[in-house]
Amino acid sequence: MKNPILNKPGFEEKYNAIGRKDSLYEGVFITAVKTTGIFCRPSCRARKPNVENVIFYDTAQQALQNGYRPCKICKPMEKQDETPDYIQTIIKELHQNPYLRIKDVDLRQRDIEPSQIRRWFKSHHNMTFHGYQRLLRINTAFSGIKKGEAISSSAFDSGFESLSGFNDSYRAVFGQSPTHTIDKSVLNIVRFTTPIGPMFACASDTGICLLEFTDRRMLETEFSDLSKRLNAVILPGDNPHLEHVQFELQEYFSGDRKKFTVPLHTPGTEFQQSVWAVLQDIPYGETRSYTQQAIALGKPKAIRAVGSANGHNRIAIIIPCHRVIAADGSLAGYGGGLHRKKWLLDFEKATL
């Protein structure tokens, strides 16, 4: 089973979505209209533009960079990528009780069309709603097995109706039967929104091991590498470190936090570890060049290696590689996109 990453729909699907004014595509794309110079949310109430006048962007920042103005009707710069309230409620219910099974008939009793919630989960988690529930139950069963519970007890307690069905689902996730995964671990993952786009956070029992924007290049490669390094499977589930990091990021984006205290778990080489430690020494609102970072590390000639280690940082913002710029003052690279790097640097300077 693939790790959850943002699944991007094609042009036709996007154009049909704006015709329906479909709020389930919030955070998936932005619509820009060539004839008006304005960009909108997928759910904007304005008249649907002709297909030849439409261009789609992943983020509002990209539309701004290309000269488009935010729509005054749908206000696409406000609360970008917010998860609909009814989906937040359902996710909270499932995480509080992973044994719960919400079926299509249950959704209809809540006046929720199953196809709508299925489409939202496919767009934002690359899995169906029922697939998401199944992974939560697998995660719960795995925790029980790790604690010494019988496999059959864990399977039925987790809501599976047959042991064979549980074994098939378990093997699809872990690649092995329950009896051969005692040495494995689970990294819990959560998707949440920020003012500059949605993010994924992963956590082990030790701490946060990944914090990335959902549209980061090579994100699936990061998931795969992290899983191999920690001999773990990434699954939705609860973890106190995930609650901790979301709380501190809310404070950060409100301008009320300049240092983070959430524990981190950063597997890597000794050199990478030292580079990431130096990154965390760069003060809020300041920048360093790659040369200055190499000097601070005590390896002034290792500029290229330092840049490579920065690029392998899996924990955005908290390990602040966005504070490293080129010697000439230009932004240089950033896995989350240069528009976000500029936003973060401007924001930190403005909130010193």
Task: Locate the predicted segments by residue.
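Basic nucleic-acid-binding alpha-helical/helix-turn surface characteristic of O6-alkylguanine DNA
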Residues: 1-27, 33-52, 58-164, 168, ...
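Short glycine/serine-rich loop segments
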Residues: 301-343
